[in-house]
């Protein structure tokens, strides 16, 4: 048995794995923020034409929210329905591309599981993580389907107005 003062190699490896997962989700969040800022910059360009999103779809004006420099601030509520749908599609594409990263994490966990010298608790934790990752359907998760249907409902609501 390991003494309480010593760290095992598997504990350090799981810490590194946790760091990799945290960095992955941080990058996903950063991508969403950068995309939103890019859409803001694109819609409040230098000319005084109609505000236009990154996908070339005109945005509705929101005169109550002006920036100090005179440009307009874009919010998801001021977007057209088509723009909202395309924005959701871009986010879902990023989520689907993340599947490769999950597969890499799963392979790494399987490698650590077969290593000698790791405790039973660590092995059971790895088993739990592997079962969680393997329980996800191969094509598209239910959460993504729910979000897509929600995006369609929001888009239909905008089309009625």
Swiss-Prot record:
It comes from the Eukaryota. Keywords: Membrane, Transmembrane, Transmembrane helix. GO terms for cellular component: membrane. The chain crosses the membrane at residues 16-36. It is found in: Membrane. It is a single-pass membrane protein. This is Uncharacterized membrane protein ECU01_0910. It comes from Encephalitozoon cuniculi (strain GB-M1).
């Amino acid at each position: 048995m390991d003494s309480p003062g010593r760290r095992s190699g598997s504990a350090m490896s799981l810490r590194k794995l946790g760091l990799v997962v945290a960095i992955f989700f941080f990058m996903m969040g950063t991508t969403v923020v950068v995309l939103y800022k890019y859409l803001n910059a694109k819609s409040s360009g230098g000319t005084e034409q109609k505000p236009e999103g990154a996908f070339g779809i005109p945005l509705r004006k929101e005169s109550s929210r002006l920036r100090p420099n005179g440009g307009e601030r874009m919010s998801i509520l001021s977007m057209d329905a088509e723009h909202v749908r395309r924005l959701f599609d871009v986010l879902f594409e990023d989520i689907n591309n993340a599947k490769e990263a999950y597969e890499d994490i799963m392979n790494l966990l399987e490698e650590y599981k077969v290593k000698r010298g790791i405790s039973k608790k660590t092995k059971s934790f790895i088993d739990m993580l592997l079962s969680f990752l393997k329980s996800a359907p191969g094509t598209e998760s239910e959460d993504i389907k729910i979000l897509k249907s929600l995006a369609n409902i929001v888009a239909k609501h905008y089309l009625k107005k």
